[in-house]
UniProtKB/Swiss-Prot annotation:
It is a single-pass type I membrane protein. This is Keratinocyte-associated transmembrane protein 2. Residues 218-265 are cytoplasmic. The keyword Transmembrane helix applies. Glycans are attached at residue 75. The gene is KCT2. The lineage of its organism: Eukaryota, Metazoa, Chordata, Craniata, Vertebrata. Its main location: membrane.
Amino acid sequence: MAAAVPKRMRGPAQAKLLPGSAIQALVGLARPLVLALLLVSAALSSVVSRTDSPSPTVLNSHISTPNVNALTHENQTKPSISQISTTLPPTTSTKKSGGASVVPHPSPTPLSQEEADNNEDPSIEEEDLLMLNSSPSTAKDTLDNGDYGEPDYDWTTGPRDDDESDDTLEENRGYMEIEQSVKSFKMPSSNIEEEDSHFFFHLIIFAFCIAVVYITYHNKRKIFLLVQSRKWRDGLCSKTVEYHRLDQNVNEAMPSLKITNDYIF
């Protein structure tokens, strides 16, 4: 029974300890998250401040070398603060009253000029720099052909140039004439082609006529026999004496042939 009682007591104690340990674990995780958020916010604020603040170095990087030289020359001409002397010569009063000497007071003009120079608006300086950048450089105006000071090239053509141009034109004309002559040899004109075609056509006709005459001359008898008609041949033969004799002999030998007009020679 005594052992069972402590076990029962340990159960509620462990149940109470579990939520406490979970809370401690959450707190331990929350601390690094909070630190990370603080670091990120600090980095963002620094970046924003850098972007908002104007950078005079960037402006100075865009300034060209002639403009920088001009600015340095102007700065050299201006008297520096150390060169301005605030001491003035002692003023001697002509009227001495009771042996009291008048104490000289320095004029406030140099100090006022220095304060005015120090109190100038930086935007005015930026505008001056932009104006210097936009204005053309004096060095480019003085030297047209580079820093070496070379003389300007004379673009006017002289008589030698004219002669050279004439020679080149003549050479080009000669080349063109040679090319045209070569083309005329290689490619005949259309007139020559037409004459050649007509010549071949006439030659073919003449050869055909010669062939016809040659054939008719060598086969004139055959052609004559083919052209002759039967009646025309009978008319020519009936007038001869030999034909009458032959006809009589045939009729006597074969009287049946009188009925027909066919004769066998």
